[in-house]
């Protein structure tokens, strides 16, 4: 928990150019609670730069919606 005793939200990302998975959990003490999850899948027909822009915009939207305190990225 953070200093105000509210759950900490963590955004996890499983990156990929074809599909990027994401999930948000809330952590309160030893308790984890699922908040939301999804997959971002830019069209394969898009040029590389446009696929990156789709990923950027979608991840920015997830961050704006769920306001995570931390982000973890899978290697």
Place the predicted regions along the sequence by residue.
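Phosphate- and other anionic-substrate recognition elements at nucleic-acid/protein interfaces
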Residues: 1-75
């Amino acid at each position: 928990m953070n200093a105000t005793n509210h759950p900490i939200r963590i955004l996890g990302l499983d990156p990929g150019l074809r599909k990027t998975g994401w999930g948000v959990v809330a952590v309160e003490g030893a308790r984890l609670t699922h908040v939301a999850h999804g997959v971002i899948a830019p069209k394969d027909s898009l040029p590389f730069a446009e696929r990156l822009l789709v990923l950027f915009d979608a991840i920015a939207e997830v961050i704006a919606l769920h306001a995570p305190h931390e982000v973890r990225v899978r290697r």
